[in-house]
Amino acid sequence: MKIISVSNVKGGVGKTTTAAVLSAGLTARGYKVLMIDSDPQTNLTMCFMPEPTDGTPSLYHVYAEGKTLDEVKTSIKLNLDLVIGDFELCNADMQFLKAGRLKMLRKAFKELKSTYDFVVIDTPPNLGILSLNAFLVSDYIIVPMAADSFSLKGVRLLKQTLDEVEEETEKEVSVVGLLLTKYSDRTNVSRLLEKSVNSAAELLNTKVFESRIRQATVLQESQIAKIDLLEYAPKAPVTTDYQVFIDELLNRIEV
């Protein structure tokens, strides 16, 4: 089982979209996948199902009550399950940090009885306790970066945090690559930012994926329709972008 976190401290970079399409794409390739929505905004959950009612088993219950992942997961379709997000996790740092819940997700994985080929975690756009829990269990991290704006500050902060995680756990957490999203080869901005993204990749000891994810309205349309992109718009250029990216990722992690 390979655990992949999709993370960036900056919002609006295609983090959740990447987690959703990656999960669906891996399932389409015959892998069994578990998605975990660790972002209190619950956008990954909303990509696949209506807003859950209060009391629906969620990731919050893993942290607050020690529920297992098997107890809280929801089946989306064959070979694709989801641990839904929860707005209650907005106060996770205040509620759980003092309670010693820094390794709750690790404990939950040790108790996981179901078998998966991949776990994809959508992390919050911050480096609080939810992201730290995700990093502690992850084998790989994907960092989406929008080609319309960029700052190295967040990358430096992510690097510092990952170094601390490795020091704490003595486990190497690999940033498998930076993924350029919202890309347009028609604009100078996208082309000019590529150099900065390469600098960010060097800082994180990784490489930029060759794949470029174009900006496209079908991304939002598929999320509103609660249909994964591969089914909603299989022939759209951005779908091809993501398919190429997934193949590149699998090759990079030698699957």
What is the predicted function of each stretch?
Residues M1-V255:
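P-loop NTP-binding core
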